[in-house]
């Protein structure tokens, strides 16, 4: 199958934007110290400050933490492609990843005063008995939550020029998170706690507080989520961080994924291209649904995307025997069309994610959760950013001593051999 001109223009155009931004910083940014410290209010919604979710784990277990030199290696790669704010997820003492990311950025800033990278610092929230052999109690919180929040406060105060946002919980209110979800009042309690610290001068007044959760948890889906505590939470946060995954819904809510009858005559590639156009419309609708509800509660509140992404390997629901959503071509279309939309509309999108992380489904190497990255664990650039490799954006950079190269050796025809037309007719 051949690349059509529209696809070439989309992928090349977005890559040129990133390339020009990166080369501008390479040519001019290295000579001057940053003239002002950016705030969350100035970063969010700013297309010059692209966002991404980041985990630097290289191995199949988080017990093997990436070193600070390895984190610096990754952060330089992300900086080169125009990323300026990273999202992390937890600050548990046995998992010092986030603290090490902050230290890595701090060191890079000392080495080069023009270096600019910020962090949305996540604090993990659990219910009682989460991740144990006991039945989770979703109406009672874990006694570890308060400690987690306090650790986040310590890091925000230690690195005030880097930490610009604290997110209380990750998908901590959505009911399909059956291992650990809590009720909205728990999130509200800690958001209010952090806001009070800001008022009392114990945290920067410019630090923004949010919670990052599924679109439904923010009132964009099932009306049963629309409770008083959620209304109060919407008023309490500085902005709403919502997650939206057309990729997963290709299996769980596939009405948009099915090839319409009036498109059955199209070529396979045209069917595939149209499927991603529908996926983008699905994403936009979830954003609109959240926005409509949130603004009915607080018209001043902004909504940004805390997570969305597209996996490139799956031996499960989304692979060849399932919805067939999974491959680098579809990831490329989704990523680039998504960035085009969010940049135009002033929506920050913490794209999920930077690098593949194989600890997420350690017993299943081809499980989709391991393969959401724009880069492989070896540092190979996937199809969405092949053009950045062509343009020399990553020249001189490496991951684990591997230079940044393209997946499939850059062979488009070989890649396309694995790209399948969307499927909804399979046993579920």
Residue ranges of predicted features:
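Acidic-and-aromatic substrate-binding clefts and catalytic sites of carbohydrate-active enzymes
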Residues: 63-66, 87-101, 127-130, 142-145, ...
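Substrate-binding cleft of extracellular glycoside hydrolase catalytic domains
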Residues: 91, 96-207
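Aromatic-rich peripheral "rim/lid" segments of glycoside hydrolase catalytic domains that contact
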Residues: 29-42, 316-337, 341-428
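C-terminal motif of bacterial Sec signal peptides marking the signal peptidase cleavage site
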Residues: 18-19
């Amino acid at each position: 199958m051949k690349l059509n001109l529209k696809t070439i223009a989309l992928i090349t155009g977005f890559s040129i934007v990133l390339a020009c931004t990166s080369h501008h910083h390479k040519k001019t940014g290295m000579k001057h110290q940053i003239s002002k410290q950016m705030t969350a209010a100035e970063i969010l919604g700013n297309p010059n400050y692209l966002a991404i979710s980041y985990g630097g784990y290289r191995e199949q277990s988080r017990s093997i933490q990436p070193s600070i030199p390895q984190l610096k290696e990754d952060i330089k790669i992300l900086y080169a492609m125009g990323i300026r704010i990273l999202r992390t997820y937890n600050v548990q003492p046995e998992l010092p990843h986030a603290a090490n990311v902050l230290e890595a950025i701090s060191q890079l800033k000392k080495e080069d005063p023009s270096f600019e990278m910020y962090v949305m610092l996540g604090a993990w929230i659990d219910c009682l008995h989460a991740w144990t052999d006991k039945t989770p109690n979703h109406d009672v919180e874990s006694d570890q939550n308060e400690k987690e929040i306090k650790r986040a406060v310590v890091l925000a105060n230690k690195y005030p020029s880097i930490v610009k946002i604290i997110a209380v919980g990750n998908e901590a209110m959505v009911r399909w998170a059956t291992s650990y979800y809590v009720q909205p009042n728990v999130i509200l309690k800690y958001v209010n706690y952090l806001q009070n610290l800001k008022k009392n001068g114990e945290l920067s007044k410019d630090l923004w507080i949010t919670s990052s959760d599924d679109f439904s948890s923010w009132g964009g889906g099932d009306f049963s989520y629309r409770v008083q505590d959620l209304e109060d939470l919407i008023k309490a946060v500085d902005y709403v961080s919502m997650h939206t995954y057309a990729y997963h819904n290709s299996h769980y809510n596939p009405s948009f994924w099915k090839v319409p009858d009036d498109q059955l005559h199209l070529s396979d590639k045209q069917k595939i291209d149209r499927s991603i156009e529908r996926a983008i419309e699905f994403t936009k609708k979830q954003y609109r649904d959240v926005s409509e509800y949130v603004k009915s509660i607080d018209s001043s509140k902004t909504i940004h995307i805390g997570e969305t992404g597209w996996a490139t390997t799956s031996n499960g629901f989304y692979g060849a025997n399932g919805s067939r959503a999974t491959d680098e071509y579809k990831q490329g279309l989704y990523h680039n069309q998504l960035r085009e939309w969010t940049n135009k509309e002033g929506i920050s999108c913490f794209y999920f994610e930077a690098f593949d992380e194989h600890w997420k489904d350690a017993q299943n190497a081809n499980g989709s959760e391991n393969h959401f990255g724009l880069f492989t664990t070896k540092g190979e650039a996937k199809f969405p950013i092949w053009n950045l490799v062509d343009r020399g954006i990553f020249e001189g950079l490496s991951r684990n001593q591997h230079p940044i190269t393209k997946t499939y050796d850059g062979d488009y025809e070989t890649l396309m051999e694995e790209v399948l037309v969307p499927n909804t007719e399979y046993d579920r």
